[in-house]
Curated annotation (Swiss-Prot):
GO terms for cellular component: cytosol. Pathway: Purine metabolism; AMP biosynthesis via de novo pathway; AMP from IMP: step 2/2; Purine metabolism; IMP biosynthesis via de novo pathway; 5-amino-1-(5-phospho-D-ribosyl)imidazole-4-carboxamide from 5-amino-1-(5-phospho-D-ribosyl)imidazole-4-carboxylate: step 2/2. Homotetramer. Residues from neighboring subunits contribute catalytic and substrate-binding residues to each active site. The active site is at H169, S293. This is Adenylosuccinate lyase. The lineage of its organism: Bacteria, Pseudomonadati, Pseudomonadota, Gammaproteobacteria, Enterobacterales. InterPro entries: Fumarase/histidase_N, Fumarate_lyase_CS, Fumarate_lyase_fam, Fumarate_lyase_N, L-Aspartase-like, Pur_lyase, PurB_bact, PurB_C. It comes from Buchnera aphidicola subsp. Baizongia pistaciae (strain Bp).
Length: 460
């Protein structure tokens, strides 16, 4: 086995391996096996305690099962994989492995016959995937989203009143502030974050076609519907009482749809920041030993935002197939979801790489105030909007077309605007307000909106 990232086929385990180390404990083959071993043994504990099974359940049994979970190792995982080569069935191999382990510490105990009792493979697998997604959301995804929002808000609050020329259709438009334009993204992200946190992660354990057939036939006096609910919810999951052989994966589609929406918002963010860097509204702090180009020594490229955009695109491309394919299964089940589900870690890995790049890029940004003011002062034509609005307020007709003729497609200076304002027949106080107006201070509520958002935001 070649362990070096140099020989990895995927850049996830190669070039970017250091960025996704934490995911290996959730989505690797080893982790998947450990989750399934844990679920098998927790189910074994659950049913062996039922009085209908008449199992002698003592401290030795409990300690044996707990030790198998707590001490699960790479050696154990490899043993399961060796068994799988013979059986060509991953979950049956886990069952044989557990029977062997339990026999070693308890001998020929009655509990051996209850390993994987009344289960179908999907009873174990769906719960494993549910836990994997639950843990990744709690420990990996949400903390990174919070960090991105925090970094965006930090820059926004620091520059809440720094004026910036807006651009609609790529052309000069009504000014905003650096802070307000960043807060737009923070608001969008927070909204998705709230939805993501509230997505119910479901699980089921109800047999080969979702009807408890084997369980009910063997022990009809047991309320298996209730036992199923108790077991699933004990794992910190929501119970799905109505399924075929498989949990239908609707929640996984919801989970990744929300992830894709966040990724799409961040692609938008990356492109906007890339553009602002190109306009020199932001500068990037150079690192002494870094090189921007193999031939152009002066270059400081927006590589973090470009890297993030590319990896978010890869993640969303796979998500597109996940959310379309997973909720569809032929009749009571087909196996086409199995290979797709094995790629959920890949999806999240590409996203994590992208999130790290955004955070790195944000920490390098410096607002270039002088360039922002220079751009604003080059576009006095944007004041046509407030001037014509005030004129309309006082019933002056055809103001829009009059200002259109003066400003549209022309280089407009402060002198042209001031001369026009002085010619207006409006109250003196209104004229004074217009004469004091500049592209730099025509900001509406931009700065205030940043503070309002910060005060109402749940993420501090």
């Amino acid at each position: 086995m070649i362990a070096s990232p140099l020989f990895a086929i995927s850049p996830i385990d190669g070039r970017y391996s250091s960025k996704v180390i934490k995911l290996r404990n959730i989505f690797s083959e080893y982790a998947f096996l450990k989750f399934r071993v844990t679920i098998e043994l927790l189910w074994l504990k659950k049913i062996s305690l039922l009085q209908e099974f008449k199992i002698v359940y003592n401290k030795d049994v409990l300690n044996c099962l707990d030790r198998i979970i707590d001490n699960f190792s790479k050696k154990d995982a490899l043993e399961i994989k060796i068994l799988e080569k013979k059986t060509n069935h991953d979950v049956k191999s886990i069952e044989y492995f557990l029977q062997k382990k339990i026999f070693k510490c308890l001998g020929n105990h009655d509990i051996l016959g209850l390993v994987h009792f009344g289960c179908t493979s999907e009873d174990i697998n769906n719960l494993a995937y549910a836990l994997m997604l639950k843990v990744s959301r709690r420990d990996i995804i949400l903390p990174l989203w919070n960090k991105i929002i925090f970094e965006i808000k930090k820059i926004a609050l620091l520059h809440h009143n720094v004026p910036m020329l807006s651009r609609t259709h790529g052309q000069p438009a009504t000014p905003s502030t650096i802070g307000k334009e960043l807060i737009n993204f923070a608001y969008r992200l927070e909204r998705q974050l709230k939805q993501f946190k509230n997505i119910e992660i479901l699980g089921k354990i109800n047999g080969s076609t979702g009807n408890y057939n084997a369980l009910h036939f063997s022990h009809s006096s047991v309320d298996w519907h209730k036992i199923s609910q108790e077991f699933v919810t004990s794992l910190g999951l929501f119970w799905n009482p109505y399924t075929t052989q498989i949990e239908p994966h609707d929640f996984i589609s919801e989970f990744f749809s929300c992830l894709a929406r966040v990724n799409t918002i961040l692609i938008n963010f990356n492109r906007d920041i890339w553009g602002y860097i190109s306009l020199q509204y932001f500068n990037q702090t150079p690192k002494l030993d870094e090189i921007g180009s193999s031939v152009m020594p002066h270059k400081i490229n927006p590589i973090d935002f470009e890297n993030s955009e590319g990896n978010l695109g890869l993640s969303n491309a796979i998500i597109s197939h996940l959310i379309e394919k997973l909720p569809i299964s032929r009749w009571q089940r087909d196996l086409s979801d199995s290979t797709v589900l094995r790629n959920v870690g890949t999806v999240i890995a590409y996203s994590i790489i992208a999130y790290d790049s955004i955070i790195l890029g944000l920490k390098k940004l410096k607002v270039n105030t002088s360039r922002l003011l220079q751009d604003l002062n080059h576009h006095w034509e944007i004041l046509a909007e407030p001037i014509q609005t005030v004129m309309r307020k006082y019933g002056i007709n055809d103001t829009y077309n009059e200002l259109k003729n003066i400003t549209r497609g022309k280089r407009v200076t402060s002198d042209i605007i001031l001369k026009y304002v002085n010619s207006l027949k409006i109250p003196r106080n209104e004229k004074e307000k217009l004469l004091q107006l500049t592209p730099e201070n025509y900001l509406g509520l931009s700065s205030k909106l940043v503070k309002i958002f910060n005060n109402s935001s749940e993420l501090k």
